[in-house]
């Protein structure tokens, strides 16, 4: 192997608490009451809205326009969430606060092993990259979490004009490293976006299954998916490929 690619959120780092908790934290000042029921409803509504959203791919190239499209994409998702659980006055002001809050490291945290594993892989002489459907705020998040300098490339959907699981975004990432698909691994927490997407582009796909999704239609073993529980298992797995 020459290059190891990673998904970002859910693979290298995670939201502190839950998205619903962050949404509710900022919504309280706008009169939204915090209860166990409202938190549960927000988390469920976010999962549904995010799942139903179109891919974050836009027919623009100007950096300012890309950021505008990203903001509108997220506005639709957050508006959809509160349309389901209860809208409130000054929603536009609220959205600006939440969108900005997720654009820095304050509400994100690295998984405990992330930095150590990335450094170990770099010490082996491997190149590292990110392939993510995150938006351009990712660059600031990576800097804030202290891992930006560990990556040789970062490929995101809004700049690549393609989103996982489409093979195009993987191929663009490969071109940046000038390697063949068989010389690269992609690690992520989604069977569809990450593992199947990587396979479509002929990379080695690895599922990081922190939640131990061992049952149901997406059972990793049933799909013969290379699976790890934490990033600590990745260096050994790579040695076998």
Feature roles, as predicted:
Residues 1-112, 124:
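N-terminal helical cap/lid subdomain that shapes the substrate entry/recognition surface
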Residues 1-4, 14, 37-40, 88-93, ...:
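Asp-based, Mg2+/Mn2+-dependent phosphohydrolase catalytic module
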């Amino acid at each position: 192997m020459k290059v190891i690619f990673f998904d970002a959120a859910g693979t290298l780092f995670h939201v502190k608490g839950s998205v619903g908790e962050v949404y509710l934290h900022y919504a309280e000042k706008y009169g939204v009451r915090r209860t166990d029921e409202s938190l549960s409803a927000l988390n469920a509504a976010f999962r549904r809205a995010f799942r139903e959203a179109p891919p974050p791919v836009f027919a623009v190239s100007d950096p300012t326009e890309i950021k505008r499209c990203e903001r509108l994409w997220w506005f639709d998702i957050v508006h959809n969430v509160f349309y389901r659980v209860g809208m409130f006055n000054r929603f536009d002001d609220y959205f600006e606060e939440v969108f900005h809050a997720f654009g820095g490291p304050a509400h994100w945290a690295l998984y405990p092993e992330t930095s150590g594993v990335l450094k170990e892989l770099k010490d082996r002489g491997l190149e590292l990259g990110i392939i993510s459907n995150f938006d351009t705020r990712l660059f600031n998040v990576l800097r804030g979490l202290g891992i930006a300098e560990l990556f040789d490339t970062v490929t995101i959907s809004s700049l690549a004009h393609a989103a996982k699981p489409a093979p195009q975004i993987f191929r663009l990432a490969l071109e940046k490293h000038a390697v063949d698909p068989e010389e690269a691994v992609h690690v992520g927490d989604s069977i569809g976006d990450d593992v199947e997407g990587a396979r479509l582009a002929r990379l080695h796909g690895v599922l990081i299954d922190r939640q131990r999704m061992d049952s149901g239609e997406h059972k990793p073993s049933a799909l013969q998916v290379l699976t790890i529980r934490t990033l600590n298992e990745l260096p050994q797995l790579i040695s076998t490929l």
